[in-house]
């Protein structure tokens, strides 16, 4: 179950099926992103694709010597653009691939528009999602719900993305969902409807143990997306932001022109592939090794190219050297900027207190540490409010809850009202009343013993103590212990055996910390394959945008009186 490989295969097949000759790849905004995640432009150029165009671009030239490969989402707009294109074709022949199921009526409309008979084929290739890592996919949807319910357009897009994912991996799963989330049940029903309607597409070879789709809701764990991160990929997303593998470095002080935007892709960058799940300290020493290796391989200025053999060796090595030079400068810049931000924002200290809020249960120590950091001028308003949110979520119903006082401290620190208001919005979004699970206190004896032993041994790294709630959920699922009264099956049948192929989807967005959890479970659990997906991949900033978009904040009030009243009521 490798989503990058699945999408890559589709694109390779499109290009191969169009035969030899020069080609143009005609895409829409979304499929452009889907393709760019798995192929670089130079890789596609090697396959005789010399031009990349958008179907909605008005000023494309007529180029009858090119074949057109169209890879488009089956939307009304795209079908209309194609109809216009086929009435006045700009290319010699058209190979049309839709990223999802296309209606018969749309195919009929296209056939009627194709008066010049330029269409060679129309097919469905189910690459209708963003393949981020081999075990991680996203739909790039921010703000999928209105209150607790789906935005209808986003429900439709998510259903399409999830069913395409299942088709691309050739899985017809049983479905379980988080009972506490109406949105999870609704999505499960929509996926099930598509499977029933398009049953012929889902007729795959039966496996002994059917695959399982588990649908979860971000509301059940609002802690994970609020934490600072210390592994490479997650940290880059948290501090710099990753958008379809691209990182905007234009705000970095003294940045050179060619490094204003860089691409981090494990497919084309060996250093990144080997380091994306390692912690920041290891990255530092690995980058030093990369630099030293680069110094050794670097062509020396005084190097004499005396013989033809010398020159040949230099020319052969130069592309590799050039690539290595680009890799070195890119990672040195990224790691340098992460380092600068950690120091400037005092993130080591901030993160230690975040971890205490997420993992420990000592209220007075936590409160003292949060108050101390709120007084620290190096701590930004963003980090200050994140600490107060973590406190508010953890100690929401604590008898000595001091949230009103912390809100006053935020105001004294000069934190903007828009941030202060978000504290109650986050509690409204993912507080105790909403959660189907208990995030903070292990209930069973085994979990309590584990936590006690963990406390005795001490934690190897205070900055990475936290494990997402997803870890516990998947651990129980793999061992056949996930409670059916909390995660029921959709429909009458249940799974007798432990699942082997698991697709987990998080409504409201997944995180790179959860992707790391899935990566580690895949690595350490023989016979189990897990793929994680989400409506988007969050960092703290985008998660707070998700909370705002849900509209729940409009019901919550910032005043400390309201906060304390609700604390008493609960």
Curated annotation (Swiss-Prot):
The modification Phosphoserine is found at residues 307, 441. It is found in: Golgi apparatus membrane; Endosome membrane. GO terms for cellular component: endosome membrane; Golgi membrane; synaptic vesicle. It is a peripheral membrane protein. The keyword Methyltransferase does not apply. SUPFAM superfamilies: Sec1/munc18-like (SM) proteins (SSF56815). InterPro entries: Sec-1-like_dom1, Sec-1-like_dom3a, Sec1-like, Sec1-like_dom2, Sec1-like_sf. Keywords: Endosome, Golgi apparatus, Membrane, Phosphoprotein, Protein transport, Transport. One of its GO terms (biological process) is vesicle-mediated transport. May play a role in vesicle-mediated protein trafficking from the Golgi stack through the trans-Golgi network. Belongs to the STXBP/unc-18/SEC1 family. Interacts with ZFYVE20. Interacts with STX6. This is Vacuolar protein sorting-associated protein 45.
């Amino acid at each position: 179950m490798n989503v990058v490989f699945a999408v890559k295969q589709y694109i390779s097949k499109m290009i191969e099926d169009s035969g030899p000759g020069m080609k143009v790849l005609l895409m829409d905004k979304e499929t452009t992103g889907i393709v760019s995640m798995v192929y670089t432009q130079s890789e596609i150029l090697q396959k005789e694709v010399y031009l990349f165009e958008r179907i909605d671009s008005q000023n494309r030239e007529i180029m009858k010597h090119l074949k057109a490969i169209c890879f488009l989402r089956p939307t009304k707009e795209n079908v209309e653009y194609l109809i216009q294109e086929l009435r006045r074709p700009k290319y010699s022949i058209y190979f049309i691939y839709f990223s999802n199921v296309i209606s018969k009526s749309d195919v009929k409309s296209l056939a009627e528009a194709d008066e010049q008979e330029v269409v060679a084929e129309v097919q469905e290739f189910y690459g209708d999602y963003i393949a981020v890592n081999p075990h991680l996919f996203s739909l790039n949807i921010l703000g999928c719900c209105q209150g607790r319910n789906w935005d209808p357009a986003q429900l439709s897009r998510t259903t399409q993305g999830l069913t395409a994912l299942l088709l691309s991996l050739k899985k017809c799963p049983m479905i379980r969902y988080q009972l506490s989330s109406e949105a999870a049940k609704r999505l499960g029903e929509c996926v099930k409807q598509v499977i029933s309607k398009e049953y012929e597409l889902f007729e795959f070879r039966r496996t002994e143990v059917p695959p399982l789709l588990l649908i979860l809701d971000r509301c059940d764990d609002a802690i994970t997306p609020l934490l600072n991160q210390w592994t490479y990929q997650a940290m880059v997303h948290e501090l710099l932001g990753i958008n379809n593998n691209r990182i905007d470095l234009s705000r970095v002080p003294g940045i050179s022109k060619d490094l204003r935007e860089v691409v981090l892709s494990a497919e084309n960058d060996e250093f990144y592939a080997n380091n994306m799940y390692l912690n920041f300290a290891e990255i530092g020493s690995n980058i030093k090794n990369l630099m030293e290796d680069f110094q050794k391989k670097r062509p020396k200025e005084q190097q004499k190219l005396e013989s033809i053999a010398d020159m040949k060796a230099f020319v052969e090595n130069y592309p590799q050297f050039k690539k290595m030079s680009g890799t070195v400068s890119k990672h040195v810049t990224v790691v340098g900027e992460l380092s600068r931000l950690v120091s400037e924002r005092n993130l080591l200290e901030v993160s230690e207190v975040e971890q205490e809020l997420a993992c420990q249960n000592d209220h007075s120590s936590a409160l003292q540490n949060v108050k101390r950091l709120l007084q620290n001028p190096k701590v930004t308003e963003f980090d200050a409010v994140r600490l107060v949110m973590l406190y508010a979520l953890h100690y929401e119903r604590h008898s000595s809850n001091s949230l009103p006082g912390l809100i006053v401290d935020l105001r004294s620190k000069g934190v903007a009202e828009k941030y202060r208001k978000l504290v109650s919005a986050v509690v409204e979004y993912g507080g105790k009343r909403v959660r189907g699970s208990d995030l903070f206190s292990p209930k069973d004896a085994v979990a309590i013993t584990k936590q006690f032993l963990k406390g005795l041994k001490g934690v190897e790294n205070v900055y990475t103590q936290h494990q997402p709630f997803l870890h516990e959920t998947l651990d129980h699922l793999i061992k056949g212990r996930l409670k059916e009264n909390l995660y029921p099956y959709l429909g009458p049948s249940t799974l007798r055996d432990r699942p082997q192929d698991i697709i987990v989807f998080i409504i409201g967005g997944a995180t790179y910390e959860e992707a790391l959890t899935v990566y580690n479970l895949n690595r350490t659990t023989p016979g189990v394959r897990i793929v994680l997906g989400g409506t988007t991949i969050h960092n703290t900033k985008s998660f707070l945008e998700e909370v705002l978009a849900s509209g729940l904040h409009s019901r919550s009030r910032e005043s400390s009186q309201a906060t304390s009243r609700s604390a008493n009521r609960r």
